[in-house]
Design a protein with these regions (language model features):
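Gly/Ser/Thr-rich phosphate-binding loop
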Residues: 6-66, 78
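Active-site glycine-centered loops adjacent to acidic/histidine catalytic or metal-binding residues
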Residues: 25, 49, 71, 133, ...
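Short Gly/Pro-enriched turn/cap motifs at secondary-structure boundaries
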Residues: 68-73, 123-127
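AMP-binding/adenylate-forming catalytic core of the ANL superfamily
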Residues: 101, 106, 119, 134-223, ...
Length: 248
């Protein structure tokens, strides 16, 4: 919803009754934060949680917000970021978000899936609940979302998070929505694919594809640019509005 709102002329509407804005469920690109605040004067408070837990990471009311960051761990949650061996990673390094249960389980976190011990064992092991979400932590303790572990693109030995590429593409004024996924490639294993919904009235041309590719190269890293760009009328989503990347 926020992504679509910032592409509209919000000055035509009376939004004076709105005092706070929050978001959860899917990470918002930094450009959305900037444009929404510019149009409304409101700062969006983002948070991270799952069906299996309550709000575990958040930009709580009164805290300093870093646009694009999920925030900091909520008090009482043993949030950490670990590598595939379950060891804590340093600041700035991607890893899986986990909840440590030592010395005791955290209130508000599920203990298992109903009649599914296999799924429970996959999520709960080594004294931690494994969320399956990848993020990194900055030097100020803020957590930044990268993507689901199974959404990370492995290309020529590089591990590329789709969210960073989506955020960069969303900075372009003619992009309404964007979903980044992996596409199979015989040489690189996988390559970055960007599925894009353009703002109404924008012509989907080959020149526009090249412009998008060059923009990503210039604002991230050359190996991260989408080698495949497709324009679509809409993106596949869940009932809650999340983009389904494995259907792109």
């Amino acid at each position: 919803m926020y992504r679509m709102l910032i592409k509209q002329d919000l000055s035509k509407y009376d939004l004076s009754s709105i005092h706070h804005a929050t978001t959860a469920g899917e990470a918002l690109n930094p450009e959305v934060f900037y444009q929404f605040e510019k149009a409304t004067g409101l700062r969006i408070h983002e948070g991270f949680g799952q069906t299996e837990m309550t709000l575990g990471i958040a930009n709580l009311y009164g805290a300093n917000i870093k646009p694009g960051a999920m925030g900091k761990p909520v008090p009482g949650y043993g949030i950490d970021i670990v590598d595939p061996d379950g060891k804590s990673v340093e600041d700035g390094v991607n890893g899986e978000i986990v909840i440590r249960t030592d010395p005791k389980p955290t209130c508000g976190v599920f203990l298992g899936y109903y009649r599914n011990q296999e799924a429970t064992d996959a999520a709960w092991h080594d004294g931690m609940y494994h969320t399956g979400d990848v993020a990194w932590r900055d030097e100020d303790g803020y957590y930044w979302y990268v993507g689901r572990a199974d959404d990370v693109i492995k290309s020529s030995g590089y591990r590329i998070g789709p969210f960073e590429i989506e955020s960069t593409i969303m900075e372009l004024p003619y992009v309404l929505e964007c979903g980044v996924s992996a596409a199979p490639d015989e040489v690189r294993g996988q390559v970055v694919k960007a599925s894009i919904v353009l703002v109404p009235g924008t012509e989907p041309t080959e020149e526009l594809k090249k412009e998008i590719q060059n923009y990503v190269k210039q604002h991230t890293a050359p190996y991260k640019y989408p080698r495949i760009v497709v324009f679509r009328d809409e993106l596949p989503k869940t009932i809650s509005g999340k983009i389904i990347r494995n259907k792109l």
